[in-house]
């Protein structure tokens, strides 16, 4: 009976069986983890033009770092003559999606109820999404690709299963640590069946991957805890193709100093801590404007907080498509995030030549060298943030020095050429071995 199970995936069923105290055994498939011979991964290799599939479980295009990463990588690879296809669930027919969803839901409910006596709504809904996405990916001829690049753990699981037949180099880039972040914010509970389920998917994504490309070194430790080998992980910091707008000089005293925050208005971005910090230093903000760029679920709450704290200098601009222009007029960029990987907005601010204040979440300390290219704080510490703001408001020389250093760092390390070149050489190494 066990051997007949193909969906849910046998390894998921085995993990859930273990959680519920059932005995089961599924034959283990040996997945090759052979790596290219040791050499500098960023030296020039083959000039072959590759055919590459970049795939994500999430909607694309969309606002945010993941969508930008995919667009940037695809654009850079195409500029070098490579063929790139991008696949995401929202590209498929809504009628077909509905049909698949309706067909699998009762089967999943029946399977989980018969086997475990009940089912988790979260797991049921997720398995339904996985099933639909897998059915869509089944229609694609993977044989025509030289390289497969999954942008999340779910796509890595699906492509990994298919790749048992095709044996293509499969790269995996996590854009966040899925289970860890959901535990941190109480979206799922510690020691729950949901934790067991998602951790198994994360571990299997690592097992299926020929190589893991991470956005920052902050991913290494949690990935290694899930079973990754350090030698199978390469850090490639995100680069962007940033429009070079000349900075707006503010020579006269009548010009206000501009502080800008570009971020989705959500609970993880820490706008409330920025507002608290501003309330501590009101006497230093008489000739200052604070621009809040972005929109989201927290807007009404933040507008009430602004009013309650008497922060007349704060202006909500909503979503904007002229962020580079806004940043070119910005003196201090602030991102008080309490949970992040490698924020695109910081990279944009550094390219614009703006002094940056942010927190030590994720890979941010790999972008901001404290007191050199900006200031790094503890997340959620409004007093530290107030002190940093006051320092840069009062100290023009420090602002200018950090701005210059940030721009120089971005021009050297955070470009599309740097990012794409490193990833392309990894692709080439694995393609040549394959």
Locate the predicted segments by residue.
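Short hydrophobic beta-strand element within catalytic cores of glycosyltransferases
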Residues: 355-358
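Conserved acidic donor-binding segment of nucleotide-sugar-dependent glycosyltransferases
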Residues: 370-371, 375-382, 391-397
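A short, well-ordered alpha-helix in the C-terminal region of glycosyltransferases
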Residues: 384, 391, 398-412, 419-425
């Amino acid at each position: 009976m066990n051997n007949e199970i193909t969906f849910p995936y046998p390894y998921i069923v085995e993990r859930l069986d273990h959680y519920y105290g059932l005995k089961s055994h599924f034959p283990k498939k040996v997945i090759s983890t052979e790596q290219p011979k040791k050499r500098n991964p960023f030296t020039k290799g083959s000039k072959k033009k590759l055919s590459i599939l970049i795939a994500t479980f999430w909607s694309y295009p969309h606002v945010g770092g993941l969508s930008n990463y995919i667009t940037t990588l695809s654009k850079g690879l195409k500029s070098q003559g490579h063929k790139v296809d991008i696949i995401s669930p929202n590209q498929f027919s809504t009628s077909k999606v509905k049909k698949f969803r309706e067909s699998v839901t009762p089967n999943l409910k029946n399977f989980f109820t018969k086997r475990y006596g009940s089912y988790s709504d979260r797991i049921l809904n997720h398995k339904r999404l996985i099933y639909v996405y897998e059915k869509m990916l089944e229609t694609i001829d993977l044989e025509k690709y030289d390289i497969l690049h999954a942008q999340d753990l779910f796509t890595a699981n699906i492509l990994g299963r298919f790749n048992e037949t095709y044996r293509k180099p499969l790269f995996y880039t996590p854009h966040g640590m899925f289970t860890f972040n959901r535990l941190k914010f109480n979206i799922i509970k510690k020691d729950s069946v949901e934790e067991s389920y998602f951790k198994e998917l994360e571990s299997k994504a690592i097992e299926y991957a020929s190589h893991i490309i991470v956005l920052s070194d902050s991913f290494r430790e949690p990935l290694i805890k899930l079973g990754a080998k350090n030698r199978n992980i390469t850090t490639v910091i995100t680069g962007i193709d940033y429009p070079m707008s000349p900075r707006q000089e503010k020579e006269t005293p009548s010009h206000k100093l501009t502080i800008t925050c570009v971020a989705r208005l959500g609970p993880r971005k820490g706008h409330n801590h920025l507002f608290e910090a501003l309330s501590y230093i009101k006497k230093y903000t008489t000739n200052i404007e604070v621009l809040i760029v972005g929109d989201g679920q927290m807007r009404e709450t933040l507008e009430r907080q602004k009013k309650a704290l008497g922060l007349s200098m704060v202006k909500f601009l909503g979503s904007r498509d002229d962020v580079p222009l806004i940043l070119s007029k910005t003196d201090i960029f602030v991102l008080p995030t309490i949970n992040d990987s490698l924020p695109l907005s910081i990279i944009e601010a550094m390219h614009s030549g703006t002094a940056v204040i942010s927190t030590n979440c994720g890979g941010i300390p790999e972008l901001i060298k404290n007191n050199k290219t900006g200031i790094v704080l503890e997340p959620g510490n409004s007093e530290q943030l107030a002190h940093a703001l006051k320092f840069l408001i009062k100290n023009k020389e420090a602002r200018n020095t950090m701005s210059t250093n940030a721009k120089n760092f971005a021009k050297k390390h955070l470009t599309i050429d740097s990012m794409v070149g490193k990833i392309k050489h990894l692709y080439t190494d694995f393609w040549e071995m394959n």
